[in-house]
Amino acid sequence: MRPRSRAGDKFMSQGQELCHEYFQLTAPCEKQPCIDMCSSKYKTGKGVCGPAVHQCFCTFSCTV
C-alpha cells in the first residue's frame, strides 16, 4: 500500500479540535494497514477505510 497524502481539514467535535487527512492508495484499502499507517504518523491517529475504496481516512487531534 503506497499512500499519497492530501492536506487535512480541521473541524470541531464536542469541544475538541480534530483534524483529518486522506491517504490516496494504489491498492484497495485494508483495515489493519490503514489503522497502522494513521497511528504511526499521528500519536492520536485513528484510521478507517473510505470513503472511496482506495482511500484511508485518518482522524487525529490537531494539538499533536
From Swiss-Prot:
At the top level, the lineage of the source is Eukaryota
Question: Where does the UniProt annotation place the signal sequence?
Answer: none
Q: Name one GO biological process term.
A: defense response to fungus
Stretches that traverse the bilayer: none
- Keywords from the UniProt entry: Antimicrobial, Disulfide bond, Fungicide, Plant defense
**Disulphide bond pairs:** 19-62, 29-49, 34-56, 38-58
Q: What is this protein called?
A: Defensin-like protein 123
Q: Which organism is it from?
A: Arabidopsis thaliana (Mouse-ear cress)
